[in-house]
């Protein structure tokens, strides 16, 4: 069997491990980075990509989203989280089918690929159909079933069976691009019994946990009333936390909770645009980073963002910390770019495979075209130009697992127009069913 080889030639290579800028080339063999240098032999290469004027980066890592909810983009804007969920999203979700979730996931996958995200972490329903969309699109994913029981024993057993079935069917699927976590929705929708069961299951299956924690002030107040403890204090008291836990949002944190997060090596997914849009609050990201806590970036769903552009999310994260702390040096462009790449990979336990440009790592890579009005002149550091000037439309090429998913802004694995047509039809049907 011969190797499939791609040479990315004459790029400006930026590695988020050290932020050194190298003008050179990179050779991909099959699914991995095989060589990085300035004089790579191209005589026997299957394909050469001319990357002059382009920045070569690791693919972005979106550590928290709900891909199928891309169908709900713009559905319930300008509302609080409580009203958004209870009065709009949950009633609409009651009419979801596996086909709708599949279409929504395909639509989301298009947006991810076209804005340079090669890996995403998702918690939702009908996740086997999301896995199908992942397999077809060519991207990488960490999937979990959103487990909610509200203290109902029968419901708890059902939710556990659903997530176990997802693990047994989909973990390692799509040539190993899919990894499955357990996904208790939150401390306020998952009972103590469910949370304790999930902790045991994650240990038993040697996998991670994906959960929403401390997203709103109401959640804090409700937790104090129910348990006389804040959410992270409560989770710590029942032995739930650990280095395999990814806590999305983590907005309202006390000093004690930051210590709890650090002691348990919990990973954090920061979702600034969603937190701003729902007026949930501003997460203390600079404090977390200063305390050596691993923080990645997430978009949340397009229903509360309203897009999946990770460059926009990283810029927002940086600017939000600066204005909140009145410190222009808070969350620098280097720190932000690391959040979107190597730190995101670490959040998902994938830092040995993706997130940086190193020989032997998976060939999850993107090219950003600097020959655009918003990128000229490029007199600042490259990371600054990406974080403060670029957007997803500047991504020219997206490669995942050594396969080209987009080149010259053209997708290679998905039929955009057909998916757009199906998505428009699906949301109209859902609106009609929800009347």
Curated annotation (Swiss-Prot):
One of its GO terms (biological process) is S-adenosylmethionine biosynthetic process. GO terms for molecular function: 5'-deoxyadenosine deaminase activity; 5'-methylthioadenosine deaminase activity; adenosine deaminase activity; metal ion binding; S-adenosylhomocysteine deaminase activity. It catalyses: 5'-deoxyadenosine + H2O + H(+) = 5'-deoxyinosine + NH4(+); S-adenosyl-L-homocysteine + H2O + H(+) = S-inosyl-L-homocysteine + NH4(+); S-methyl-5'-thioadenosine + H2O + H(+) = S-methyl-5'-thioinosine + NH4(+); adenosine + H2O + H(+) = inosine + NH4(+). Pfam families: Amidohydro_1. Signal peptide: none annotated. Zn(2+) binds at residues 64, 66, 212, 300. Its cofactor is Zn(2+). It is an enzyme of class 3 (hydrolase). Binds 1 zinc ion per subunit. The keyword Zinc applies. SAH is a product of SAM methyltransferases and is known to be a feedback inhibitor of these enzymes. As a result of this inhibition, organisms have evolved efficient enzymes to metabolize SAH via different pathways. The pathway found in methanogens differs from the canonical pathway, it uses the deamination of S-adenosyl-L-homocysteine to form S-inosyl-L-homocysteine for the regeneration of SAM from S-adenosyl-L-homocysteine. 5'-deoxyadenosine is a radical SAM enzyme reaction product which strongly inhibits radical SAM enzymes. Catalyzes the deamination of three SAM-derived enzymatic products, namely 5'-deoxyadenosine, S-adenosyl-L-homocysteine, and 5'-methylthioadenosine, to produce the inosine analogs. Can also deaminate adenosine. The preferred substrate for this enzyme is 5'-deoxyadenosine, but all these substrates are efficiently deaminated. Likely functions in a S-adenosyl-L-methionine (SAM) recycling pathway from S-adenosyl-L-homocysteine (SAH) produced from SAM-dependent methylation reactions. This is 5'-deoxyadenosine deaminase.
